Amino acid sequence: NNGTVKYGVGYSGSNITVKYYHDTQDPVTGTVDYGKSKFIKLYIQNTGSTATTATLSTILGYEKGGDLIVPSGYTLVNEKKALSSKEVLQRLGLSYSKETPNFSLTSAENGTNGIYAAEDDLGTSYYFRGNVTNNYVNFAGKAWRIIRINGDGTIRMIYDSLPTEGRRDSTLLVNSSDFTAPMNDNAYVGYMYGTAGSSTYESTHSNSTNSPIKNAVDQWYDKNIVNTGYEDYVADAIYCNDRSVYEGTGIGTAETGYMPGNRLLSSTPTLKCVNKNDRFTKSTTLGNGKLTKKVGVVTSDEVMYAGATSSESNAYYLYEILNDSSNGSWTMSPIAFSNGGVYSSCVLNGAIYASPDICYFTSNYAVPVISIKGDAIISGTGTSNNPFKVE
């Protein structure tokens, strides 16, 4: 067509998905002048299990701004390919160490400060450890620290109230009695509760009722993310409430040890969440689909990856976020059902505890954790003076 016309890219084929790359030279749709060219970088994926053929076509509109004429059987390319975790790391100007730290020692004890890699449920995750100074983020008018780049390329961050508010947010303080009440059944182990008195593990941990810790961060998320217009930047992600057992049945009032406690004692953290029922997500694609808000809290494994052990230490970036002179913070990781009570791990004085005798004599904070899209950060170097910014 002569003149200026609208253009797009279409595709057809069985079990085919086509997306455009973040760094494509030209937009995937727009207008083009007669005799000019557009260069679009595409990602083509076979979503089936056998070989297939993809057909690509330039889609044009009539002259003088007419709408695109999409042939029957063709789909317009309009979705951007998500950045991989490694691409996000590089885009932020960061690099990682291939070393695997000894998690029985604090980051201060073995000098492991920086970015390291570990597998999660979605791929390779890059996590920050020790006294790092390059993971500061400014988002929604608040300060955050990056915990890790998730395996799918989204960026997991924890809220840091001190730089902007100068104090802890008291609405996030959850009493130990509230967090675990009524405490008398394995059903109350978790981010959401199941049905007490059940005879099966599935019903016991059926995720039917919010815990106080979930209510606290959900309400905070509504007020500070949804109501301020920033939710479009937030990605769905897995928040792991690992209720897999290593001893006992996890049913009724049976004495039960849960795997996060075992990993704390053996210093063997993981970023993988074994059971789909424990992967708290908003959609059912990644996990259980039980979240109504795209927010969770940190796990005991993530605190270990950050540099903590059961020994008190202030030499890691989560220390000031999770501790103050009076209170610590809850994690999302259950420890046990024992002596008729429910116990989850907490962080106090910089140490991560699996002991029920320590966490339940105090009120602790539920500190919100969210994940933003991998391409949401557009400026900054990640330092406290020049944090990464989402605009």
Residue ranges and their predicted role:
Residues 2-12, 26, 30, 34-391:
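Long, domain-scale functional regions
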Residues 22-23:
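Short, hydrophobic beta-strand segments
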